[in-house]
Amino acid sequence: MKILYVEDNDDNIYMLKNRLTRAGYTVVVATDGAQGVALAASEQPDLILMDLSLPVLDGWEAARRIKATPTTSRIPIIALSAHAMTGDQEKALAAGCDDFDTKPVELQRLLDKIRTLAPPESAA
């Protein structure tokens, strides 16, 4: 299963990409929201992990654009945020994200969300 991880923090990328790879996932990385939108279209991942605080295009707008594009609209998106502020989850879901999780990521909880939104049998 292929996951697109949209994140601009190198430490977060290194940590989560390695953990997901060890769990058996192929991980493609975008470092800003615009690149995330482009890679969602070209890579057609099974699921997207989207940081919300991104350069160029924030995660909320990137999620809106991905969900508004017919070729990417069905890709599940899990929003990730270190700022678990009141309203962030609601704002992410309103932007089209399918789920929300906080950073630092608790791996087992995130893996459970990934399996729920993109079960292995749905992988291309």
Feature annotation, model-predicted:
Residues 14-22:
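Charged docking surfaces used in two-component/phosphorelay signaling
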Residues 55, 73, 85:
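The feature encodes the CheY-like receiver
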